[in-house]
A protein has these predicted regions:
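Feature marks short, surface-exposed loop/turn motifs that line or immediately flank catalytic pockets
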Residues: 24-26, 51, 81, 109-114
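N-terminal binding-site loop/beta-alpha segment at the start of enzyme catalytic domains
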Residues: 1-71, 88, 101, 133-139
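Short active-site-adjacent helix-start/loop capping segments
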Residues: 54-55, 70, 81-83, 115
Length: 140
């Protein structure tokens, strides 16, 4: 069953092949969606700061009946956060909103701020600064 299958990443971490995407699920409804998905066998939950539902996702994780270490949680740094300090604060804020001690996968939501998408500045230097904050928080 595909819900029990994983991909192995280069660092040895396993990520479930399928995950519940929570985009456009309201914060006050997402906890129930998370609990139902986990009951069906999902172990990967994907959210983002931009979805504005990390609080509800955190509640769903806490109340789903599956131990945290058996879940894989992904969230994303806002696309317009492009400094080391913004990224660092962003990671801390996600941990607080989700009420988690760690996040399994934290990624940059988009290489350019949504309002600057397709413009000439590709934010290479800025994304390196954001990456440095991600590496600071990475724990294996």
């Amino acid at each position: 069953m595909i819900l029990k299958e994983n991909y192995k990443l280069n660092n040895g971490v396993e990520i479930p092949k399928l995950g519940l995407g929570t985009w456009e699920i309201a914060d006050n409804k997402v906890a129930d969606a998370v609990k139902k998905a986990v009951k069906l066998g999902y172990r990967h939950i994907d959210t983002a700061q931009g979805y504005e539902n990390e609080n509800g996702v955190g509640i769903g994780i806490k109340t789903c009946g599956v131990e945290r270490e058996n879940l894989f949680i992904t969230t994303k740094i806002q696309a317009d956060f492009k400094t080391y300090e913004e990224a660092r604060r962003s990671i801390i804020d996600s941990l607080k909103r989700l009420e988690l001690e760690y996040i399994d996968l934290m990624i940059i939501h988009a290489p350019q701020p949504w309002t600057k998408f397709r413009e000439e500045n590709h934010y290479f230097k800025e994304n390196i600064d954001v990456w440095k904050a991600l590496e600071e928080f990475y724990k294996m």
